[in-house]
Amino acid sequence: ALITTMAKMSFSNNTKRFREPNDVIFNVNNELYDSINGNGDYFTAFYGVIDMEKGMLDFSNAGHNTIFLAHADGSIDCLENNGPVVGVVKDLPFQVTSHSLRNGDRLVLYTDGVIEARDEQAALYGEERLMDIIAKNMSLNVKDFTEHVFTDLQAFCGNSPRCDDIALFAIDIIGIN
């Protein structure tokens, strides 16, 4: 909990100081390195900036899962930018990736607990199943969509134990000029 609080404060401070996602994550990494290096702790992070006038997403990814960008037609782009996790090595550069956005797109971010959830036979939920659920449910609003994913995940897992946090975040893109 302490590391999470420190990370939240660091992100809050650095997003005020820097616009570029790689600069934000670079500085968060350096600030937290001294606090968590050597004790085996680290964390993943995704930081993105959406420019609604240009219809662009600029992002950096520090060891987090692939981000899905779903389109209204059901196709999905996998937004990958696999930087190192935060807190392990100081002064590592992080990369910025840019991707165009369109009205009707949906960004889907999730924790590894979603794709690593297992059913009673120990099969993984996986990225493919999540992508299929995303593609087939683009017509749902964000609230109904996320509830549908969690309902499907619960049905898949049955009575198997949950071993990790499970979170999913979706953003519908509307109002691009």
Residue ranges and their predicted role:
Residues F11-N177:
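Conserved subregion of the PPM/PP2C metallophosphatase catalytic domain
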Residues A1-T5:
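Conserved long alpha-helical elements within nucleotide-processing catalytic cores of c-di-GMP signaling
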